[in-house]
């Protein structure tokens, strides 16, 4: 019966795991026979097999979900976005480079209806559709078909899937694999990580897994403490009994941290370390507030010493390849990557967008339109590996889908976050009426949030920052995890008047 009630959870988890195992979702042709069926399964789970409350029948659960779906602006915005992505299939133009013989013979390169969204390659557009349709169907399923327990279970599955993908790295290294999952699909025998053909994408993926794992571990600690208080047992005795139950989530969390470091992605090295430090301080602050003053002083000294030892060992025992990447990190380099200074991609992408500001040039259109915009000097320095990306996800999406497409995506993101921000406001108001000993640490704006929600937001911000200087969100494994984890945040929020 529990399995039946969790069908929606498992089908969303299956879609997220499929993206990550199908080479991060970057191999478009491999998604075609898989992802449409998984999207249909999630849609079936959303409409027919939503999770039920304890005193609810299946019919009542379906009625509840259908009613909320119809009233939710997010549903209609997502459907409108799907229609927007479908229009280019009916409005195909020609590529100045790929279709040059046809254009030279007199063919009109413009799409049949110039004032509507278009593409120059339908298979490329289909690849983008296979990113967003399953991802956003998963978002609706998580929001409406999963209860709070289902949302939490989903993220547990995602974290353990990340753990398996990290273990794959060690196995591939030991067996001398020449490509992801022992295939020859990698562009370079040394340039892949786990199932990802581009290590920088893998770095962002494992950074997110690390943040999610850390947040779930914090939640596990709080649940155990609440259980001990309710049962009224001796805490010292139970702390030994429940040690494994308290801390087993640190295993995938630690493995994901080292996996992110070992991708040798400088952005991931910086971001995963920063997230680790922030979550360490957040955890220490919350725990110290619950202790008496003598225990607080003792724990503070021990914690500071432990942190100093970890930092010292990290600096002294850092592997040579990691040290080599860390040595190249400086403020100027970071700003250059985020602004695109010194690379032609940002200038070329901006030039293309100015010519097609509203609807862009269609899925993967940048690679078809970039060469005519390049100077002779830039053509001589043409980037062969990774040159189809702007290495700025925000700008590339704007170029390929225009202001309208970017507007849809921004609206969807706001609608996902809006219910959580309302509950956040309720928690802030409620915290002001608590007794001083019961209040969260300062600043309340941060510590009033449950730790998993704070960790999810940190991971999302890290991905958005990384996307300014690279292309992590061109991997649907990361794109789907970004949106779905944000949609799952309400599984950790306490009930308020805006629940």
Label each residue range with its predicted role.
Residues 1-21, 35-47, 82-83, 123-318, ...:
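Alpha-helical transmembrane segments of multi-pass inner-membrane proteins
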Residues 25-28, 90-100, 170-181, 316-324, ...:
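Helix-to-loop transition at the C-terminal end of transmembrane segments
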Residues 496-499:
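Short, charged juxtamembrane terminal tails flanking transmembrane helices
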Residues 191-195, 275-276, 295-297, 312-354, ...:
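Flexible juxtamembrane loops connecting transmembrane helices in multi-pass membrane enzymes
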Residues 198, 343-387, 394-397, 401-408:
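TM-adjacent membrane-interface loops and short helices in multi-pass inner/ER membrane proteins
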Residues 11-26, 43-134:
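N-terminal hydrophobic segments of proteins, predominantly signal-anchor/transmembrane helices
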Residues 19-22, 107-121, 183-196, 340-344, ...:
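Juxtamembrane membrane-water interface segments that cap and precede transmembrane helices
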Residues 98-111, 177-192, 321-338:
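Extracytoplasmic catalytic-loop and juxtamembrane helix elements of membrane-embedded
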């Amino acid at each position: 019966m529990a399995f039946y009630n969790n069908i929606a959870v498992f089908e969303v988890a299956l879609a997220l795991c499929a993206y990550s195992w199908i080479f991060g979702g970057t191999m478009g042709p491999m998604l075609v026979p898989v992802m449409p069926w998984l999207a249909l399964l999630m849609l079936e789970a959303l409409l027919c097999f939503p999770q039920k409350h304890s005193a609810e029948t299946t019919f009542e659960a379906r009625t509840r979900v259908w009613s909320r779906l119809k009233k939710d602006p997010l549903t209609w915005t997502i459907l409108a976005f799907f229609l927007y992505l479908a229009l280019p299939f009916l409005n195909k133009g020609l590529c100045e480079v790929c279709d040059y013989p046809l254009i030279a013979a007199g063919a009109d390169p413009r799409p049949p209806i110039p004032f509507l969204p278009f593409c120059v390659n339908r298979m490329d557009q289909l690849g983008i559709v296979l990113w967003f349709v399953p991802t956003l169907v998963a978002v609706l399923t998580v929001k409406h078909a999963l209860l709070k327990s289902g949302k939490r279970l989903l993220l547990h599955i995602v974290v353990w899937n990340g753990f398996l993908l990290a273990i794959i790295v060690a196995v591939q290294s030991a067996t001398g694999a020449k490509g992801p999952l022992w295939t020859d699909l990698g562009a370079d025998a040394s340039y892949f990580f786990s199932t990802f053909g581009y290590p920088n994408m893998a770095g962002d993926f494992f950074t997110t897994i690390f943040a999610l794992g850390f947040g779930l571990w914090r939640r596990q600690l709080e649940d155990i403490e609440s259980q001990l208080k309710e049962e009224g047992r001796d805490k010292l005795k139970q702390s030994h009994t429940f040690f494994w139950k308290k801390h087993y989530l640190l295993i995938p969390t630690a493995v994901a941290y080292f996996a992110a470091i070992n991708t040798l992605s400088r952005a991931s090295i910086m971001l995963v370390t920063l997230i680790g430090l922030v979550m360490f301080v957040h955890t220490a602050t919350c725990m110290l507030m619950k202790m008496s003053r003598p225990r607080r002083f003792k724990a503070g000294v021990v914690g500071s010493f432990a942190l100093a030892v970890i930092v010292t060992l990290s600096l002294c025992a850092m592997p040579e390849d990691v040290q080599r990447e860390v040595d190249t990190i400086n403020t100027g380099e970071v700003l250059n990557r985020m602004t695109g200074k010194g690379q032609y991609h940002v200038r070329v992408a901006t030039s293309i967008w100015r010519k097609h500001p509203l609807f862009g040039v269609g899925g993967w259109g940048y690679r078809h339109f970039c060469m005519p915009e390049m100077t002779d000097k830039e053509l001589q320095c043409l980037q062969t590996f990774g040159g189809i990306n702007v290495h700025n996800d925000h700008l590339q999406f704007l170029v390929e889908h225009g202001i309208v497409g970017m507007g849809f995506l921004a609206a969807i993101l706001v609608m996902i976050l809006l219910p959580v921000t309302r509950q956040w406001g309720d928690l802030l108001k409620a915290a002001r009426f608590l007794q001083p000993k019961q209040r969260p640490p300062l600043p309340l704006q941060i510590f009033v949030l449950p730790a998993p929600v704070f960790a999810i937001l940190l991971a999302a911000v890290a991905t958005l920052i990384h996307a300014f200087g690279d292309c992590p969100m061109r991997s649907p494994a990361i794109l789907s995890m970004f949106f779905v984890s944000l949609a799952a945040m309400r599984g950790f929020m306490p009930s308020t008047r805006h629940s």
